[in-house]
UniProtKB/Swiss-Prot annotation:
This is UPF0380 protein YubP. Changing H14R: In plasmid IncFII R1. Belongs to the UPF0380 family. Pfam families: DUF932. The gene is yubP. It comes from Escherichia coli (strain K12). Keywords: Plasmid. It comes from the Bacteria.
């Protein structure tokens, strides 16, 4: 059956402290999968994700968020795609914290992937950096553990650049027309056709809290990201019926939208610099 990369409140966990193995087992059992899925060939090198996590823990990286895809085929549940967000010890406090996003599965739907990200505490937004900051992919063969550890340090090496770009965005002011343009571009990423967007750019750039009322590029982006990921905005469908935007609850959709929004923000940064 087709993998449905979705997770809900029973398939994800987030804490303000490192997650324990018991918590990971309860919410993301595929991290502990005892073997590869039967569809994988003999060339597939199987290593439980928890082994990778423990090696990363030894290097000072701790998981604070984890989620697992819901699947229609229950036979794939223990092998399904999972995502963890890890932080380096000593880099936990502050308004934003850099993270390593680790994705994997044991059913063939994903290699090991590591992507740089940022977690924003005020709105609990988990951001994903665009491809221009590097994305590490490790296939299921050879010295997986060594390659993943090396990849983690490669991702760690781009955090300074990520932070520099973030601080630059905080210094860039956007007027109302420019914010509208940002919101419009974001809606096109999600819905592709302006005639099918259930909400307006004004709605997607509206802040949900007073801390996000600033008009800089960074904050505008945060407002858009939160409104798109969390959903719940009132609007009208293409047929004119009242509707509400849906939250983005799939791993693949979350990564895709986040990367696209980062690209839009980077384009605005270059345009306004």
């Amino acid at each position: 059956m087709r993998l449905a990369s979705r997770f809900g409140r029973y398939n994800s966990i987030h804490r303000e402290r490192p997650l324990t193995d018991d918590e990971l087992m309860q919410f993301v059992p595929s991290v502990f999968s005892g073997d590869k899925h039967e569809s994988r060939s003999e060339r597939y090198t199987y290593i439980p994700t928890i082994n990778i996590i423990n090696k990363l823990r030894d290097e000072g990286f701790q998981p604070f968020f984890a989620c697992q895809s819901r699947v229609r085929d229950l036979g794939r549940r223990e092998y399904s795609k999972h995502m963890l967000r890890l932080r380096r010890e000593g880099h936990i406090n502050g308004q934003e914290v850099p993270e390593i996003i680790l994705l994997n599965s044991h059913d063939g739907s994903s290699s090991y992937q590591m992507i740089p990200g940022i977690f924003r505490f005020v709105c609990t937004n988990g951001l994903v950096c665009g491809n221009n900051f590097g994305e590490i992919r490790v296939p299921h063969k050879g010295d997986i553990v060594g390659q993943v550890i090396e990849g983690a340090y490669e991702v760690l090496g781009v955090f300074d650049k990520v932070t520099d770009n973030m601080e630059a965005m905080k210094e860039i002011h956007l007027n109302s027309d420019e914010q509208h343009l940002f919101g419009r571009a974001a809606l096109m990423v999600r819905y592709e056709d302006e005639n099918k967007t259930p909400v307006t750019p004004e709605q997607i750039i509206t802040p949900r809290r007073w801390e996000d009322k600033q008009n800089d590029l960074w904050t505008t982006w945060q407002r858009v990201q939160e409104n798109m990921i969390k959903g719940g905005l009132s609007g009208r469908s293409a047929s004119g019926k009242n509707t509400r935007t849906r939250a983005i609850t799939g791993i693949d959709g979350d990564i895709r939208i986040n990367k696209a929004l980062w690209v839009i923000a980077e384009q605005f940064r270059k345009w306004k610099s």
